[in-house]
Structure formats: structure tokens, C-alpha cells
Amino acid sequence: MSYTVIYAGTFDPMTNGHLDIIERASELFGQVIVAVAKNPSKQPLFSLEERTALVRQSCAHLANVQAVGFSGLLADFAKQHQAKALVRGIRGSDDIEYEIRLAQLNDKLSGRLDTVFLPPSVTWRYLSSTMVREIYRHQGDVAQFVPNAVLCALKEKE
């Protein structure tokens, strides 16, 4: 069976850890929709359109991956795209309790939506968008942490 799954996040900015999860999900599932979320409670570094374009560029080598910007409930977005499951990255024990509650909530809201947890490769386990933003704001080199498209976009912001 060829399933559609959704990997959602704000991706502000997209990191190599995100790309690792997307690449691995693309090997496991027929179609991966990267749902780039508009989160009104956050002040993003990049606009929704920019973040969606950066995910698209970073995933151009993956034929079964598409990036779509969205706002609203993820469970509703999943229904609209007939997704069978959500893919979530789990970096460590700090993430597990929150992610399990979120998975249960999305399942309840959608009627039936499973969540598949993928730990990132050991290389990227410590990495987060927040860390990348902090390094960037302090003029640090983020080249090893982000896809090339993101690095170019960050340099254009300087």
C-alpha cells in the first residue's frame, strides 16, 4: 500500500535534522506532505511563503515529497489531504510526553489519524530550529546545520 503521511512544523528555519526525517519518511511512505505551519503566536524569521519555498527547494531531490503551507488544525489539514498518519521527530525523552498527548489529540480530532515517531539520526539528535536561530542571531556559522537553500536565504537576510 502507498500511504500519504504528513510531516508538520514551522520549519523556521528548516534544519538538516528536519531534512533527515523527511528523507527517511520518503523511503517508508508513498507520499510525504511537508505541512509548513503558520503559527500566529510565533515571530518567524521567514514568512510562511519563504519557509514553504525553502522546504520545497531543500526537498527537490525527493520525487514523493511536496511542501504545502497551512494554517488551522493539523487534523483538518490531514483530512483534506487524506493522510493516513502524521510523522513526528522525537529527539529525546523531553519530547515524548508532549508528542504522545499531541498524537492522541490529533487522533481524537480527526476520527482516525495515527502518528509515527521517527528519531533523528544521531548526527542531528541535538539540533533544533531554535538553536539555529540563536547561532544565526549571534553571527555564528550555521552552514553545517541547514540545507544549502536555507543557508543562502539566511545570508540574504544579513
UniProtKB/Swiss-Prot annotation:
Catalytic reaction list: (R)-4'-phosphopantetheine + ATP + H(+) = 3'-dephospho-CoA + diphosphate
Alphabetized UniProt keyword annotations: ATP-binding, Coenzyme A biosynthesis, Cytoplasm, Magnesium, Nucleotide-binding, Nucleotidyltransferase, Transferase
SUPFAM superfamilies, sorted: Nucleotidylyl transferase
Disulfide pattern: none
Cofactor annotation: Mg(2+)
Residues with site note (Transition state stabilizer): H18
Coiled-coil residue spans: none
Residues binding substrate, per UniProt: T10, K42, L74, R88
Binding residues for ATP: T10, F11, H18, G89, I90, R91, E99, W124, R125, Y126, L127, S128, S129, T130
The EC number(s) this enzyme carries: 2.7.7.3
Keyword Signal: no
Listed GO MF terms: ATP binding; pantetheine-phosphate adenylyltransferase activity
A Gene Ontology cellular-component term: cytoplasm
Subcellular location: Cytoplasm
GO terms of biological process kind: coenzyme A biosynthetic process
Record-stated family: Belongs to the bacterial CoaD family.
Oligomer and partners: Homohexamer.
Name of the protein described by the UniProt record: Phosphopantetheine adenylyltransferase
UniProt organism field: Actinobacillus pleuropneumoniae serotype 7 (strain AP76)
Lineage, highest ranks first: Bacteria, Pseudomonadati, Pseudomonadota, Gammaproteobacteria, Pasteurellales
Gene: coaD
